[in-house]
Amino acid sequence: MRVSKQKAAENREQILAAAARLFRENGIAATGVDMITRRAGLTHGGLYSQFGSKDAVAAAAILVASRKSARRLGRPDERQPAEQGLRRVVGQYLSTSHRDERGRGCVLAALGTDIPRQPRAVRQAFTIAVEGAFDLMAGWMPDRGTSRRQEKGYRRVFGDGRGADPGACCKR
């Protein structure tokens, strides 16, 4: 049975929401397609027609989860002192509710140890998510107009995702 474009888009969103949550709760390797489709209320065929593979689901789910986290954190407000915004973001990140809600928490922290064993597409998606998180956090740094050298230092301190994708280290 053929589904409408709107229904296919809804199915895709359901799959990604279920996968993002399950991957954060259980890890990528421990989460099966059957678990994802059951949580999404769809069939295996629905998942494979949308994505083609579990790896493609994982890559897309990482990006969706990281964007959702970024929206939750919000953007830096130039009118607000950087330290105040940074304090708010760090407080949110380190809160007990964030810590205890692993399925809704930071996809980077939840999957960081899984990523080196994942296929290239998943590692690349993780690298993009790490870079996005760094760029977002850079907006809350006390000196928003940092030099390139300072920026490199921040990347070393906070991590830059290159460990997730060994090929990325050659790009910079």
Language model feature labels by segment:
Residues 60-63, 74-105:
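Hydrophobic alpha-helical connector segments
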Residues 1-10:
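N-terminal intrinsically disordered/low-complexity leader segments
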Residues 67-70, 75, 87, 102-105, ...:
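Amphipathic alpha-helical packing segments from all-alpha helical-bundle domains
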Residues 14, 18-56, 60:
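Helix-turn-helix
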